[in-house]
Amino acid sequence: MKKLWGGRFTKTAEEWVDEFGASIPFDQELVEEDIEGSLAHVTMLGECGILPAEDVEKIKDGLLRLLEKAKRGELEFSVAYEDIHLNIEKMLIDDIGSVGGKLHTGRSRNDQVATDMHLYLRKRVKEILSLIRGLQRALVSQAEKHVETIMPGYTHLQRAQPISFAHHLLAYVWMLERDYERFSESLKRINRSPLGAGALAGTTFPINRQRTAELLGFEGIYENSLDAVSDRDFIIEFLSNSSMLMMHLSRLAEELILWSSQEFQFVELDDAFATGSSIMPQKKNPDMAELIRGKTGRVYGHLMALLTVMKGLPLAYNKDMQEDKEGMFDTVKTVIGSLKIFTGMIETMNVRVDAMEKATKQDFSNATELADYLAAKGMPFREAHEVVGKLVLHCIEQGVFLADLPLEVYKEASPLFEKDIYDALNPRTAVNRRNSAGGTGFAEVRATLAKVKERLGTL
């Protein structure tokens, strides 16, 4: 089959070589963006007098027909034409004749593919931003129900101090807010047009790059043609931001997996987000949370893969850069899917309030309250820490908890202990006293919820 670029070649590659080099199996994902970019390009060619109006109208009509077919999933692509750009050009020529070959005037596939990817990521990042907001709202909705639900807070996966469950959920809301900010800020760099940079050096045609940027909704153009066609920073930044987001989702997934286990029993995931066992009838496995935790690794891999591809490339375009797309497409799919799944899991999970509160009474997470109690009465904190540590050891040896100790045992440890020590040991009291800024006290959590809801526009 004759290549659209085959003039200087005396023989064609074998089919298996074409298949190895072709990107159409995956870059057909860019079909709508490719046609949209071509529509802007040919419009500009007409406005600049580079192509006659009659040719421009024929090309635009043909492209619009192809765009409608693309949206209906009716286009058939061929490996013989390598990539999405040549496939679309061949289809256009087949439809309107040789005039379709004028579309590529003043343009290279190098600036064309870069434009396609900028358009693609701009759409997908905006979708991701909307989904992040959706997950935040789901977390806030659960948090509102559980301001006064208390649970153990953990360090080293050991019970540390009692906290409000809402406080725990809000920690993830703030993590997601940073993700939202990173993706939002990346749009400034994504929303630049490389179209018109040519292969690497610009073009001799009197094109108007600002006009195509305007038609495509870009905020401006790349100011250097070499940079325009060789830049993949915007994809690397997207993969980096996605890795950070997936890391946050993975951490919450890990907690949901633990909390839904028989050992914790803090939450129950809805049946829609769990599966059973092929052999053990009693099993309810948190598969969706586990998959999100697992898929985080593949997103990390895509980031490292593209960094490795780009690290040794001289300017400008190199075929290595074809490897930028599959990881980008897969990351988009993974991130969007993970956010949708997670929102559903959070919205529908059943919180076992009694199990959480019971757990705060069967440990020593109130030990810090004792140390603070003594410090508030004038004992240096390090001495208080020592006193309470010995009391904890005594409890462990006796098989009891701090609230079970009689007052005389406390008095023997320090004369500063009084009857009110038992109020301090109450987990609910302990939580509610921590009203420093950003703390877990109920009043502070409600104040934080109000701030978050105002930011999310859900008041």
From Swiss-Prot:
GO terms for molecular function: argininosuccinate lyase activity. One of its GO terms (cellular component) is cytosol. Pathway: Amino-acid biosynthesis; L-arginine biosynthesis; L-arginine from L-ornithine and carbamoyl phosphate: step 3/3. It is an enzyme of class 4 (lyase). It catalyses: 2-(N(omega)-L-arginino)succinate = fumarate + L-arginine. InterPro entries: Arg_succ_lyase_C (IPR029419), Argininosuccinate_lyase (IPR009049), Fumarase/histidase_N (IPR024083), Fumarate_lyase_CS (IPR020557), Fumarate_lyase_fam (IPR000362), Fumarate_lyase_N (IPR022761), L-Aspartase-like (IPR008948). Its EC number is 4.3.2.1. NCBIfam families: argH. This is Argininosuccinate lyase. It comes from Geobacillus thermodenitrificans (strain NG80-2). The lineage of its organism: Bacteria, Bacillati, Bacillota, Bacilli, Bacillales.
